[in-house]
């Protein structure tokens, strides 16, 4: 809601929201309701599992999430944003202390396969 408020204050067609399902899982009471509220200002969507790993391997309800994106006619980008190896600089910056996935190449392949069911 804060992001939508900021968009309304700026009131420019090039200003919108990037929703990140990993963070929405932490911050939002209902991910799908939040997506519906963002409908007209949703410009980009980040996907990862609840542990930042392979989508579909954890607790997030991606069937409902992607059904909601379909309901609002979202046609923008969907980007994987996984931080799966602890020994990389980005993971150090995020304080990722353990490997989420052992093989990053397999993780990308499996994630792509999973997302291709929806998008």
Regions found by a protein language model. Give the residues of each.
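Histidine-acidic metal/acid-base catalytic patches
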Residues: 1-19, 23-119
């Amino acid at each position: 809601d804060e992001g939508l408020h900021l968009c309304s204050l700026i009131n420019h067609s090039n200003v919108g929201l990037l929703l990140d399902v990993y963070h929405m899982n932490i911050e939002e009471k209902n991910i799908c309701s939040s997506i519906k509220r963002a409908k007209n200002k949703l410009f980009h969507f980040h996907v990862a599992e609840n542990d930042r790993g392979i989508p579909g391997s954890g607790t997030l309800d991606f069937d409902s999430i992607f059904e909601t994106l379909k309901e609002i006619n979202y046609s923008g980008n969907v980007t994987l944003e996984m931080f799966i190896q602890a020994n990389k600089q980005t993971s150090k910056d995020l304080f990722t202390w353990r490997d989420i996935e052992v093989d990053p190449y397999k993780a990308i392949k499996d994630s792509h396969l999973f997302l291709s069911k929806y998008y």
